[in-house]
């Protein structure tokens, strides 16, 4: 099941191929991704982050075993073969416990790694770049690498214990700024320098040797770097190949390594393709998929208001706004400005903090109410044309059923299609 190692081998042989990683726990996003991969007969890489899923439940309330069960059950229900499903863990390390002393945070990180590997996650991103309570800021490359090597050893031992062999594939390094989109308004972004990338690699190689892990180096398939792509609330910093050319050329000297690019959300299709050509061959996407989900839901809510008497409407938009105001912890430190600016950001920001609220029971009830209201009778074509024009074209051509669920799924798949095309290769 070495889909990733094989992808890297083909890329190194000149195929200019890649793979995208779906970073979301939302059932509709995952259904869209599984159905899209099934239709195109490709493997599917789904990743959970250390914030979403951990041994204590993360913000989704799921452990790694829970998440795997949830994804596999969904895949089975859609007849997607589990051997084409790759599960990854993203930013695994002391990320969740930076407020604790390093010894305690790393003990938790050991258990985090054990829980992911024991649950059958095969792509493991080791990220120990963050300073803990009693650490200097920033950490040296050597400390980061030593901690990553410690976690790699835990991962290897856990994998052998549970599966009889160590077949994990690793990603090392981190991007700047923090995961999940920038907090501040951006205008310019520093690209990782070749020297910094080399220093990260050599520090990790040395640390792995000290742990007796030389043999796993060929399974370290990717280094996370910053190719110069990012987004904030209303802007996207587009990939500029010229600025990343030295970095791109540097990785050509490493036989089994490519780059992994985070925060590729909202890049143009041309930029996504160029990133893969330039060896940033693992493209992470998350907020752009839940952003598309949100677009489709807001569009359907607008259609509902045209069709259904006000007192019978789901009120999805207002419920979402009320819940976000009642529980501001997921957006308050991200969205700034006056009341109107924050209101707009809650609904429309590229950073899509609303994604943390879809599982809320009130919002979920409003969503179910919306779908029921629109499923009772066919949605008039002119309203689909008005609010979901790309889906309207497919409905008219007969390739898409105009049901609420299918319209949502297809709108998300429009984003997945851009990533699929970027990763196909020659």
UniProtKB/Swiss-Prot annotation:
Pfam families: GatZ_KbaZ-like
One record GO biological process: phosphoenolpyruvate-dependent sugar phosphotransferase system
GO cellular component, one term: plasma membrane
Pathway(s) of this molecule: Carbohydrate metabolism; D-tagatose 6-phosphate degradation; D-glyceraldehyde 3-phosphate and glycerone phosphate from D-tagatose 6-phosphate: step 2/2
Top-rank lineage group of the source organism: Bacteria
SUPFAM superfamilies hit by this protein: Aldolase
Spans traversing the lipid bilayer: none
Family named by the database record: Belongs to the GatZ/KbaZ family. KbaZ subfamily.
Function noted in UniProt: Component of the tagatose-1,6-bisphosphate aldolase KbaYZ that is required for full activity and stability of the Y subunit. Could have a chaperone-like function for the proper and stable folding of KbaY. When expressed alone, KbaZ does not show any aldolase activity.
Subunit structure, as described in the record: Forms a complex with KbaY.
Protein name, as recorded: D-tagatose-1,6-bisphosphate aldolase subunit KbaZ
Organism field: Escherichia coli (strain 55989 / EAEC)
UniProt gene name: kbaZ
């Amino acid at each position: 099941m070495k889909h990733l190692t094989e992808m890297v081998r083909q890329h190194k042989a000149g195929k200019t191929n890649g793979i995208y990683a779906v970073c979301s726990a939302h059932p509709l996003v995952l259904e869209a991704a599984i159905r899209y991969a099934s239709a195109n007969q490709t493997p599917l890489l789904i990743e959970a982050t250390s914030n979403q899923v951990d041994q204590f439940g993360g913000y989704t309330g799921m452990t790694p075993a829970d998440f795997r069960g949830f994804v596999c059950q969904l895949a089975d229900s859609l007849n997607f073969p589990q051997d084409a499903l790759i599960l990854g863990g993203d930013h695994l390390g002391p990320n969740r416990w930076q407020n604790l002393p390093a010894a305690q945070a790393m003990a938790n990180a050991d258990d985090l790694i054990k829980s992911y590997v024991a649950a059958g996650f095969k792509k493991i991103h080791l990220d120990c770049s963050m300073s803990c309570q009693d650490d200097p800021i920033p950490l040296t490359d050597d400390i980061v690498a030593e901690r990553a090597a410690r976690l790699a050893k835990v991962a290897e031992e856990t994998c052998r214990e549970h599966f009889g062999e160590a077949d994990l594939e690793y990603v090392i390094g981190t991007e700047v700024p923090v995961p999940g989109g920038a907090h501040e308004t951006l205008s310019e972004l520093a690209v990782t320098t070749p020297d910094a990338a080399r220093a990260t690699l050599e520090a990790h190689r040395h640390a792995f040797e000290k742990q007796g892990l030389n043999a796993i180096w060929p399974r370290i398939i990717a280094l996370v770097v910053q190719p110069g792509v990012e987004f904030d609330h209303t802007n996207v910093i587009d990939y500029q190949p010229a600025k990343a050319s030295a970095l791109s050329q540097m990785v050509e000297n490493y036989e089994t390594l490519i780059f992994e690019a985070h925060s590729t959300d909202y890049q143009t299709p041309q930029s996504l393709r160029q990133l893969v050509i330039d060896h940033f061959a693992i493209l992470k996407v998350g907020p752009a998929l839940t952003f598309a989900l949100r677009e489709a839901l807001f569009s359907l809510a607008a259609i509902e208001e045209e069709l259904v008497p006000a007192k019978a409407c789901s009120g999805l938009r207002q419920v979402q706004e009320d819940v976000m105001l009642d529980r501001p912890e997921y957006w308050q430190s991200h969205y700034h400005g006056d009341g109107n600016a924050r209101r707009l950001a809650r609904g429309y920001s590229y950073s899509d903090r609303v994604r943390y609220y879809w599982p809320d029971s009130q919002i979920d009830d409003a969503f179910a109410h919306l779908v029921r209201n629109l499923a009772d009778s066919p949605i008039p074509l002119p309203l689909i044309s008005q609010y979901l024009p790309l889906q309207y074209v497919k409905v008219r051509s007969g390739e898409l059923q105009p049901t609420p669920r299918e319209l949502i799924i297809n709108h998300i798949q429009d984003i997945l299609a851009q990533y699929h095309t970027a990763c196909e290769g020659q």
